[in-house]
């Protein structure tokens, strides 16, 4: 077939992929199929996608939203001196491309409106939020870059020698 350009919504939903994408825009090169796209091999694929905060929250096991200025926010309840208080954690999303995980860095934490020192913030963040795995992106693609925005996390994708099929 040669080259194929695919723009898809809800990529991974029908295959029950671990990581589903709201939208994906992919360029595929050297696409070969012998059964009218029931199966195919793709020499190279790359493009962009959108991971919404609902799915990201599900993967993280914690409610994540967009904060501001490229930061992601986690609001959680915690107990301090026997009283339940709200903790607001904001941080920059960082991708570990080798491990295919995301973490929050440069964390800022406010508990009951009081900003915690950086060391305390990092320790609390480590206890509350583990690295978020991106393994299981549809089609065997991997993330190369992430950019948080109001509509979700924009994820650049790449894949080589992909076999797609039933």
At which residue positions do the language-model features occur?
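A structural signal for short hydrophobic beta-strand segments in well-ordered beta-sheet cores
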Residues: 64-65, 91-95, 146
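Short, well-ordered strand-loop elements centered on a beta-strand within folded domains, enriched
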Residues: 39-40, 44, 97-109, 154-158
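A mature extracytoplasmic/lumenal domain signature
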Residues: 10-12, 30, 78, 91, ...
């Amino acid at each position: 077939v040669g080259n194929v350009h695919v723009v898809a919504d809800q990529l991974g939903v029908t295959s029950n992929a671990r990581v589903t994408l709201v939208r994906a825009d992919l360029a595929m090169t050297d696409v070969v199929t012998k059964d009218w796209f029931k199966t195919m091999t793709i020499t190279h694929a790359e493009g962009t996608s959108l991971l919404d905060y609902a799915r990201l929250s599900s993967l993280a096991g914690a409610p994540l939203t967009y904060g501001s200025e490229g930061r992601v926010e986690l609001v959680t309840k915690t107990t301090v001196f026997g009283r339940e208080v709200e903790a607001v954690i904001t941080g920059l999303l960082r991708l570990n491309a080798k491990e295919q995980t995301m973490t929050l860095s440069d964390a800022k934490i406010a508990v009951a409106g009081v900003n915690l020192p950086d060391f305390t913030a990092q320790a609390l963040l480590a206890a509350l939020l583990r690295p978020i795995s991106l393994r299981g992106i549809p089609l065997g693609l991997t993330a190369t870059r992430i950019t948080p925005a109001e509509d979700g996390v924009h994820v650049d994708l790449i894949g080589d020698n992909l076999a797609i099929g039933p």
